[in-house]
């Protein structure tokens, strides 16, 4: 909490004592952030993963291709860091989109350290 100190004097204060007024303002805490992760599988086409990254995470083709290769080689990649609600929505959108296109692509989220 931050505090501001204000000195106040009273005209009628015979002893010239100063009154102290302490105002506190609560410091708001930033909400926790969550990493959205894309997981590799042996069946989802690479082109589909690139399309998902462009469509749901606003990446250009080169960025999406680079992340897709990371997912392919390492098995997982962070595709973005968001507030809880946004991360949850992105995971849901990606999973629904993959399911509609009959791909087993997995997308998860975890709290950022």
Curated annotation (Swiss-Prot):
Biological process annotations from GO: protein catabolic process; proteolysis
Superkingdom per UniProt: Bacteria
Purpose: Involved in the modulation of the specificity of the ClpAP-mediated ATP-dependent protein degradation.
UniProt-listed NCBIfam families: PRK00033.1-2, PRK00033.1-5
UniProt family annotation: Belongs to the ClpS family.
Assembly and binders: Binds to the N-terminal domain of the chaperone ClpA.
UniProt name for this protein: ATP-dependent Clp protease adapter protein ClpS
């Amino acid at each position: 909490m931050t505090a501001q100190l204000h000195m106040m004097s009273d005209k009628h204060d015979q002893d010239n004592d100063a009154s102290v007024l302490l105002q506190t303002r609560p410091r708001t805490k930033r909400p926790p952030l969550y990493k959205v992760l894309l997981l590799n599988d042996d069946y989802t086409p690479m082109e589909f993963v690139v399309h998902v990254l462009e469509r749901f995470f606003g990446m250009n083709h080169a960025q999406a291709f680079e992340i897709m290769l990371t997912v392919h080689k390492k098995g997982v990649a962070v595709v973005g860091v968001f507030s809880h609600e946004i991360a949850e929505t992105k995971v849901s959108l990606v999973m629904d989109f993959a399911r509609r296109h009959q791909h087993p692509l997995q997308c998860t989220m975890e709290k950022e350290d």
